[in-house]
């Protein structure tokens, strides 16, 4: 199986950094991506909810095509009132 184009020449090792509750935030994700691993965070770490779009703006503006991609952990449980809004923002910002 070959490496998908999104990862080719962008990863130093094939690792996804754990999306740590409360701990993971844009600066950590940017550092992870620049180190050559997939940076990730739970969308619910962005509080209040309007903060999530600011986080995606920061990631989109500071990461380049040479950095590893990032991932958003969306909580799809029925008790998450932000799911639809957060998913729409992921689509808007073309989260890899």
Language-model regions, residue ranges each:
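Active-site entrance/lid segments in N-terminal catalytic domains of soluble metabolic enzymes
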Residues: 1-96
């Amino acid at each position: 199986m070959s490496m998908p184009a999104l990862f080719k020449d962008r990863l130093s090792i094939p690792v996804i950094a754990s999306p740590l509750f409360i701990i993971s935030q844009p600066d950590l994700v940017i550092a992870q991506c620049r180190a050559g691993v997939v940076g990730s965070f739970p969308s619910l770490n962005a509080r209040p909810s309007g903060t999530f779009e600011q986080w995606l703006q920061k990631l989109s503006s500071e990461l380049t095509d040479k950095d590893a991609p990032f991932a958003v952990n969306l909580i799809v449980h029925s008790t998450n009132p932000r799911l639809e809004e957060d998913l729409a923002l992921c689509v808007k910002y073309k989260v890899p």
